[in-house]
Regions:
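A short beta-strand-loop structural module common to alpha/beta enzyme folds
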Residues: 1-4
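FMN-binding flavodoxin-like domain, especially the glycine-rich phosphate-binding loop
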Residues: 9-163
Length: 163
């Protein structure tokens, strides 16, 4: 439970889950909360038992909190045994099927075809910024306070010299 993957080498991060009681899998959301970074490009894949409504709002919330970009969501019906459906053997038996899987592949191919170059360009900018930040560390909170104090002291020196 405390092992988290390094997602930094990936241009697009795909988070896939079934929908459980209207939400993405809690463990997947925990991993996303721990691993996503500012500027990550995320695509959500989901299977749902009920209607095709936006069930990925919890993944969207995690992405917003981490300043990652949720590009799009793809969903298809999945086998569901929630509540009364359990009594009749479930609904959407045999789903996702090959047609649903082909739809997901076509969805991804369209995404790469339409936005692949843009995503690669943005990733190159991000890699350049990461390299700069690694070469020039900010120094943390105390360093920022010292730098601010020095700037304020210089302003007071200038006003004293002017008088």
């Amino acid at each position: 439970k405390n092992e988290y993957p390094d997602l930094s080498p990936y241009h697009i991060i795909i988070m896939a889950s079934g929908i459980y009681y209207g939400n993405f899998d809690k463990d997947l959301l925990r991993v996303a909360d721990h691993c996503l970074r500012d500027g990550d490009k995320v695509v959500g894949l989901m299977t749902y038992g009920g209607q095709a409504k936006f069930n990925g709002r919890d993944l969207d919330g995690v992405c917003r909190m981490k300043f990652a970009n949720l590009l799009c969501m793809y969903g298809c019906p999945g086998f569901d045994t929630y509540g009364p459906f359990k009594l009749v053997g479930g609904m959407n038996k045999g789903r996702p099927n090959q047609e649903d899987i082909d739809g997901a592949v076509a969805f991804y191919d369209r995404l790469v075809e339409d936005y692949g170059e843009i995503i690669i360009e943005e990733r190159a900018k991000r890699d350049k910024q990461d390299a700069f930040n690694a070469a020039h560390p900010a120094g943390g909170l105390m360093s920022n306070i010292k730098r601010s104090a020095k700037k304020i002291a210089k302003k007071f020196e200038k006003t004293d010299d002017a008088q």
